[in-house]
Amino acid sequence: MAKDDVIQMQGEVLENLPNATFRVKLENGHVVLGHISGKMRMNYIRILPGDKVTVELTPYDLSRARIVFRTK
């Protein structure tokens, strides 16, 4: 999949789930399932409920997302 196909959005982490998965509420009100990207996992970046994150969604499955950036 090309990088051009992704949709980037801002959201807030609602809760931690097993296997580095999180429930994220997007700015538009939708709640999606997000997992940590590989670079964030390799650099041991911690994500806690309440953190603001940037997620990437594919146009094929809008219920799942990849967390690519965490802001304070």
UniProtKB/Swiss-Prot annotation:
Question: Principal place where this protein is found?
Answer: cytoplasm
Q: Which residues form a coiled coil?
A: none
**Location relative to the cell:** Cytoplasm
Q: Specify the S1-like domain's residue ranges.
A: 1-72
An annotated GO cellular component of this protein is:
cytosol
State the PROSITE patterns in the record. Answer: S1_IF1_TYPE
Instruction: Tell me the keywords, alphabetical order.
Output: Cytoplasm, Initiation factor, Protein biosynthesis, RNA-binding, rRNA-binding
Highest taxon above the source species? Bacteria
- Give the Gene Ontology MF terms in alphabetical order: ribosome binding; rRNA binding; translation initiation factor activity
Enumerate the Pfam families for this protein: eIF-1a
The family line of this record is: Belongs to the IF-1 family.
On assembly, the entry states: Component of the 30S ribosomal translation pre-initiation complex which assembles on the 30S ribosome in the order IF-2 and IF-3, IF-1 and N-formylmethionyl-tRNA(fMet); mRNA recruitment can occur at any time during PIC assembly.
Q: Function, please?
A: One of the essential components for the initiation of protein synthesis. Stabilizes the binding of IF-2 and IF-3 on the 30S subunit to which N-formylmethionyl-tRNA(fMet) subsequently binds. Helps modulate mRNA selection, yielding the 30S pre-initiation complex (PIC). Upon addition of the 50S ribosomal subunit IF-1, IF-2 and IF-3 are released leaving the mature 70S translation initiation complex.
What name has this protein been given in UniProt?
Answer: Translation initiation factor IF-1 2
Q: Which organism is it from?
A: Cupriavidus necator (strain ATCC 17699 / DSM 428 / KCTC 22496 / NCIMB 10442 / H16 / Stanier 337)
